[in-house]
C-alpha cells in the first residue's frame, strides 16, 4: 500500500513538473522551425526573391500563439537578422507584415529597438531599447 502511494505521488510530481515546464521547453526549441518559415522572407528582404512566397510562409507562424512563444519567435528573428546583417536596418524586411497585410506577426516581427522580453499577446508594436 505504501509503495502504491509513493508511486502515485512520484507520478503526480513528475506530471506537474512537465505541465509547468512545457511552455518554456516549447519556446526554447522553436528557432529551427521559425528560421525555416522565414527563409523566403529573408530572401525577399535581401532583394533576392518576390514577396508572395514570404507572405504565404507567414501564415505558418500561427503556432506562435502564447506570450512565451511570441517572445521566443522574436528572439529567433533577432538571430536571423544578426546572421544576415543586410536585414538590420532594411525597411523592406521590417515592413513585411504590413506589405503582406499580416497583422498576426506584427507584434513580434523584428524591427530596430524591439524588446522581445516585453512582448505580450495583446501588444501591437513595442519600440524600446535595441536588443542585439
From Swiss-Prot:
<dbReference type="InterPro" id="IPR016140">
    <property type="entry name" value="Bifunc_inhib/LTP/seed_store"/>
</dbReference>
<dbReference type="GO" id="GO:0031640">
    <property type="term" value="P:killing of cells of another organism"/>
</dbReference>
<dbReference type="InterPro" id="IPR036312">
    <property type="entry name" value="Bifun_inhib/LTP/seed_sf"/>
</dbReference>
<dbReference type="GO" id="GO:0006869">
    <property type="term" value="P:lipid transport"/>
</dbReference>
<dbReference type="Pfam" id="PF00234">
    <property type="entry name" value="Tryp_alpha_amyl"/>
</dbReference>
<dbReference type="GO" id="GO:0042742">
    <property type="term" value="P:defense response to bacterium"/>
</dbReference>
<protein>
    <recommendedName>
        <fullName>Antimicrobial protein Ace-AMP1</fullName>
    </recommendedName>
</protein>
<keyword id="KW-1015">Disulfide bond</keyword>
<dbReference type="GO" id="GO:0008289">
    <property type="term" value="F:lipid binding"/>
</dbReference>
<feature type="disulfide bond">
    <location>
        <begin position="31"/>
        <end position="76"/>
    </location>
</feature>
<keyword id="KW-0611">Plant defense</keyword>
<keyword id="KW-0295">Fungicide</keyword>
<dbReference type="InterPro" id="IPR000528">
    <property type="entry name" value="Plant_nsLTP"/>
</dbReference>
<feature type="disulfide bond">
    <location>
        <begin position="55"/>
        <end position="100"/>
    </location>
</feature>
<keyword id="KW-0929">Antimicrobial</keyword>
<feature type="disulfide bond">
    <location>
        <begin position="41"/>
        <end position="54"/>
    </location>
</feature>
<dbReference type="GO" id="GO:0050832">
    <property type="term" value="P:defense response to fungus"/>
</dbReference>
<keyword id="KW-0044">Antibiotic</keyword>
<comment type="similarity">
    <text>Belongs to the plant LTP family. Highly divergent.</text>
</comment>
<comment type="subunit">
    <text>Monomer.</text>
</comment>
<comment type="function">
    <text>Antifungal and antibacterial activity against the Gram-positive bacteria B.megaterium and S.lutea.</text>
</comment>
<feature type="disulfide bond">
    <location>
        <begin position="74"/>
        <end position="116"/>
    </location>
</feature>
<feature type="signal peptide">
    <location>
        <begin position="1"/>
        <end position="27"/>
    </location>
</feature>
<keyword id="KW-0732">Signal</keyword>
Amino acid at each position: 500500500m505504501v509503495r502504491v502511494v509513493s508511486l502515485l505521488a512520484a507520478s503526480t510530481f513528475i506530471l506537474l513538473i512537465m505541465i509547468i515546464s512545457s511552455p518554456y521547453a516549447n519556446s526554447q526549441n522553436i528557432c529551427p522551425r521559425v528560421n525555416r518559415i522565414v527563409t523566403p522572407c529573408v530572401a525577399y528582404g535581401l532583394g533576392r526573391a518576390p514577396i508572395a512566397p514570404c507572405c504565404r510562409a507567414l501564415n505558418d507562424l500561427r503556432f506562435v500563439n502564447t506570450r512565451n512563444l511570441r517572445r521566443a519567435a522574436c528572439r529567433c528573428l533577432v538571430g536571423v537578422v544578426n546572421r544576415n546583417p543586410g536585414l538590420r536596418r532594411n525597411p523592406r524586411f521590417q515592413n513585411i507584415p504590413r506589405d503582406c497585410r499580416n497583422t498576426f506577426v506584427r507584434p513580434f516581427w523584428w524591427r530596430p529597438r524591439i524588446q522581445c522580453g516585453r512582448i505580450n499577446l495583446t501588444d501591437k508594436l513595442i519600440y524600446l531599447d535595441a536588443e542585439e
